[in-house]
């Protein structure tokens, strides 16, 4: 960074697969075979065998009937929610959901859907909203792991509520590197998964996995699928190779190493996203700068990304971090605590 070597605690490369030799080799081979880009949308001439192979692998990995690729995870949420939205549809969204879900809900509203936000992880509030809209076609959408706090949605309880009110449950699995995929049917509720290829898998792209009928609908209706160039062969091949690593003994070992890192930095925390909430923007910026002086890149997150008064350091851990790097981070955080964040 600016001529200095620093250790990044800002990347979403949770398992370190962007640098995995098998993943890199797959991208190179795909580029040599199919070219650097797809050249067109999937419904014109942009589809390559690697796209279909990856979609099949995602469906198998996620335990779903089928899956469809999008250029990014952001585009996947936009395409899914805009397609689900329409007159007579009510979408219920956690207030701390990712921006892609928020914008997808806006597109759904433009298509005639009603959108209600429920308080963060407040199942009673959600239950009240669901009951108030009985008779409508209802959708509940949530992050599985929330991107700023690193906390986890109670999928089983959400599914029970959805089953009770005949609602579809959509879960954004973007940051869910340590949790097993939800089943297609949880406590009687149909579960649709949205995911990204850019975090756990170290590539670029997004997907929706769910019932075959929904995937077919998205292929024919989702504008962020139809009217955009297909994902590159390199990214698709890299993601496919990464899935195979994740499903192997090596993948399990990487996940266990990540769990161990989390336990050293924040015992009991459920995800590799660890917030250090400092309150005001100045304190967060000063703490980030102090860590940078120590060779540790930890970003300060401020409004409007987070609420006023909750500015923070956002630590993102990776299995690629060494034990010494984790030790340096722990020591630096203790120093900040002793110095009052300055």
Regions found by a protein language model. Name each.
Residues 17, 21, 29, 33, ...:
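PLP-dependent enzyme catalytic core of the Aspartate aminotransferase-like
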Residues 115-171:
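Active-site phosphate-binding strand-loop segment of PLP-dependent enzymes
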